[in-house]
Amino acid sequence: MPCLIAENLTYSYSTQIPPALNKVSLKLEPGTLTALVGPNGAGKSTLLSLLQGSSRPDQGEITVGGKPLINNRAQVALMPQRGKLNWSFPITVEGLVSLGRVNHSKSTCCELEAALQRVGISHLAKRRLDSLSGGQQQRALLAKTLMNPANIFLLDEPCSALDPPAKEDFLIIIRQ
């Protein structure tokens, strides 16, 4: 399994001073669980966006398995913050989880069912996202992330909107 290395990342939103990130370096080893902790506005989501390849740093380099991230993005999956998504979009749970899959073969259907079962929402597969609770939406996002063939998973506030027992279940799923 490849590791992800970020070296001296700097990122600014237009002419923002100081930059959102300034010379940040880190190494994510295979099989580890790492948490980014800090106050709101500290740049955690910005860093995750860079590490996933959604944005490019102004300076610095990101590699996965020794190769530039741009050539190896399939190794990295991002579960975005729940609040950053438009939950009124008319789509079902299974539609969200399978979104972006090129073919919907029998194996894709089996993977979909396994992902929904793994996060405990297979009974909600046909329900629209806007009819779900915040915690159920969070589980749908995790199922979508788990459908990804990546080896590195970046989760942005994965336990928001979850009650304490659900947080514990969620962390068990993530550790697996």
Question: At which residue positions do the language-model features occur?
Answer:
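The feature captures the beta-strand-to-loop junction immediately N-terminal to the Walker
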Residues: 37-39
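Helix-to-loop junction immediately C-terminal to a conserved catalytic motif
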Residues: 52
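Conserved ABC transporter NBD signature motif
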Residues: 60-76
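Conserved ABC ATPase "signature" region
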Residues: 109-124
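Conserved ABC ATPase signature
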Residues: 128-132, 136
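Catalytic Walker B motif of ABC-type/P-loop ATPase nucleotide-binding domains
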Residues: 153-157
